[in-house]
Amino acid sequence: ITVNDFPSNDLQFDAPIVDHQQLEKILATPQTFDTSAMINGDELAYVLFTSGTTGSPKGVEVSHDNFMTFVDWMLSDEFKIKEHANFLGQPPYSFDLSNMYWLPALLPGGTIKALPHEVVENFGQMFTALPNLDLEVFVGTPSFADMLMLSPAFNQQKMPSLKTFLFCGEELTVKTAKGLHQRFPDAKIFNTYGPTETTVAVSEIEITPEIIENNDRLPVGYAKPGVKLSIWNGDQEITTPGEQGEIVISGNSVARGYMNNPEKTAKSFFKIDGVPAYRTGDAGTLDSDGLLHHKGRMDFQIKLHGYRIELDEVRASLEKSPLIKQAVAVPKYNKDGKVTHLIAYVIPNESTEDTAGLTKQIRESLDGLIMPYMMPTQFVYRES
C-alpha cells in the first residue's frame, strides 16, 4: 500500500501496489465474513526467530493476548500518541520493533510511511525523503537516529510535525538523547525495554533533559500494566533496591515459549505463583520506586543495530564455511559502550597472503548460511 510520498520514480517493487484511492474503494465494498473459526487469545499470533548458541535460531511463539496487551499499552495515555498520526516504518517485519508501529499506527487511523530498503541504503535519497513525509512518530533504534542526525535537515525546523520518538532494541545513550533534544526541543523521547520473548517491550520512560543531566546511563522505565519486573540472583528474588542481578519479567507479556524446543523453553520460561515468567539473561537494578536500569548482558549475547546476537551462534555459523578451521566472534565497542560491529578472528584451513581474497571467498561460502546482520565486517587471520 503506497501513499506516493517518496520523491523518486526509480523504486522497484515485486508486489502489487494499492494506492489510497483503491484502498478506499476496497474498504467501501461490503464483505461477508465466516465467524465459525474464531481465534482464542492464547493461540499463536506470530513467530519471531532470535539468535541461538548452537547456530540454530529459536522461534519465539507470541500469542494474540500477548500482542494485544502490548498494542493496548502503546495506545494508552502513557505514550500520548494521537489518532491519524504518521509513523515512520523503518524497522523490517523480521524485527519485533516493527510491531511498535504497524498496529499502533493503523488501529487509530494512522499512516505508516515505510522506508524501502533501497532508500535506507542510499543516504542522499533518505535524507531528501524524510522531510517530505510529514512524520509525527519516529519508531526505530538509537543507531538509526544517530545515522539520521548526520543530516543537518533532521531537525525541528525542517520536520516540525515530528513530536514523538519511540526507541527500543538497543541502549539509548545520553549522547543520542541529548542530540535529539537539541534538534527537536519540543519532542517527547521515550525509552523502552523488552526482549522478543516478552512481546516487544515491557517498560517505558520519557527521557527528559533532567533525566539526561542526572544519569550516565539512561533508565529503561517502569513496568507496563499486567507485568512485574524483578531482579534475581539464581533462583532467589532480590528485594534490596539498587542491588544488581538478572532481570526477570512476569505477566501477560511473556510469550508461550520456543517453537518445537521444550528444552530451551524449560530453561528460560517458568512460573511465579502461577504467572508466566521469563529469565532475560540481562543484568539490571530496580530503584525503590520500580524504575528499571539495564546493565548489559550476563552472558555472551550482544545487541547490534537492534538485533540480539549470540556470539557463539556467529562462531558456529562461521565454522560452516569449508575455508575456516576455527573461528571466534568479538564485538567492537565505541566510547559510549555500544557495539558498532563484529570482528571475526579466524584460523583458515589453508594459509594465504591474499587475505582480502580469502575474506571474499568466506563471505560467498556462507551465503544463505548466516543472517546478513550477523556477518562480521572485519576478518583477522591467525595461524593458531
Task: Please identify what each model-predicted range represents.
Residues L107-G110, L135-V139, M149-P219, K228, ...:
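Gly/Ser/Thr-rich phosphate-binding loop
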Residues L44, T50-T53, F87, Y93, ...:
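Conserved S/T- and glycine-rich ATP-binding loop of Class I adenylate-forming
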Residues I1-A37, F67, F138, K188-N191, ...:
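AMP-dependent adenylate-forming
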Residues A45, E61, M68, N86-L88, ...:
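Short, well-ordered beta-strand segments
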Residues D5-P7, G110-L133, V139-M147, E171-L172, ...:
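ATP-dependent adenylate-forming carboxylate-activation enzymes
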Residues L44, P91-F95, E118, S143, ...:
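Conserved AMP-binding
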